[in-house]
């Protein structure tokens, strides 16, 4: 047992050392020659000191992300190989009389252990954001958000475990298919209630306060055939200096949300471009496409998980102290497989997201007919968020849900030079 834990610990340390070297010792932040002197060149809109700080901040945040990903994996492996997972199950069975309550208790203890192990890394990330003046959130507010997240995820997680293990016992061969079929309406339900029930637990949402800006947005929304009452402002200035806007929800609860930091720090032309971008997501139904894609990928994922889970339990039954696939003590193994597979498909999902973001950028430029506002918006996003204009390759692959700032500015410049725009100017 100790050898396995030591080997896993060594692998984790070597993994961390690689990413330390990757971000802090080997990084080449040189701007391509073709970009120098253009609007995509960070030297044209950021001071040397700002560039240095953005580089430092991004490297630290990226490093924390990459060492955080396998931390759960290491924890789950240790719980299994040490027999702690089995001991927790036996302890709860002795303390609680009913199977339902035993499952709830086991999930609670596992969730609590996972939270306590990952909390220090989350705390470091929060402190880094404070140190670089990105976060404005108080410690009490940050702690409150952590508690809210735990009590939102715990009942959802518990429900999933109860259903999955019931299916594994009753339908050993087809449990993965039935589980996926149940996730379809469940995912739709969560998407539907998120804007009106879950999100307001963290922040205050309200209609736009700036009525003059609202009238401009109404005109833009009318051009895009979008209901104006679907545009909201959210109070984020108490937590961050960063800028953002997004589309969320489905059906009657679908809405476009603007952070108040965005409204406070950008001029009207930039805000209108951002609205045009988000309207592009709305018009092109990217939320629905993303949801459909998620459900299709999850179908394949459940199938793969079933095969891996069955084979892994058979091969490691003795080492992990498991009775079989139905054993609740095997839950860390199931979570390990889900987590690894989810991370493995991240490059694909990010590539799809970058494509959609690029399309939304194009839509926003065409709707507002203001390329300069788009370029200025991207530049301001980099400055206020201390974003790397051209992040390292692994960051683009595993964290890049949006094109890089450099790519977005270059795309905007290409949009300006496109044949249809040249023809329109003649």
Swiss-Prot record:
Keywords: Hydrolase, Metal-binding, Metalloprotease, Protease, Zinc. Its EC number is 3.4.24.-. Gene3D superfamilies: Metalloproteases ('zincins'), catalytic domain (3.30.2010.10). It holds the Pfam family Peptidase_M48_N. Zn(2+) binds at residues 277, 281, 357. GO terms for biological process: CAAX-box protein processing. Its cofactor is Zn(2+). It comes from the Bacteria. One of its GO terms (molecular function) is metal ion binding. The active site is at residue 278. Binds 1 zinc ion per subunit. Belongs to the peptidase M48B family. PANTHER family: CAAX PRENYL PROTEASE 1. This is Uncharacterized metalloprotease YhfN.
